[in-house]
Design a protein with these regions (language model features):
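A broad helix-preferring feature
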Residues: 9-11
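Short beta-strand-centered aromatic/proline hotspots
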Residues: 20-33
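Mixed-charge, Lys/Arg-rich low-complexity intrinsically disordered regions
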Residues: 1-7
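Intrinsically disordered, low-complexity, charged/polar segments
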Residues: 44-64
């Protein structure tokens, strides 16, 4: 699955964890047209944001 396949607000990780900690979980945000990337933030830190390309592989099959 890739970032562009997720809906806004869905949780994901960048590595395949079975039971990730709060620091390893991201939330998909809005698409930024000027940078052509998706803004994603950490679940545990609302001021942290990271821009990811739409074809970045993410993992959603985990227990949180």
């Amino acid at each position: 699955m890739t970032v562009k396949d997720l809906k806004i607000g869905e949780y994901f990780t960048l590595k395949p964890y079975a039971e990730p900690t709060e620091n390893q979980v991201y939330v998909r945000g809005e698409y930024d047209r000027s940078e052509r990337k998706y803004c994603c933030g950490k679940f545990s830190d609302i001021s942290y944001s990271r821009m990811l390309k739409g074809d970045t592989i993410v993992y959603t099959d985990f227990t949180f």
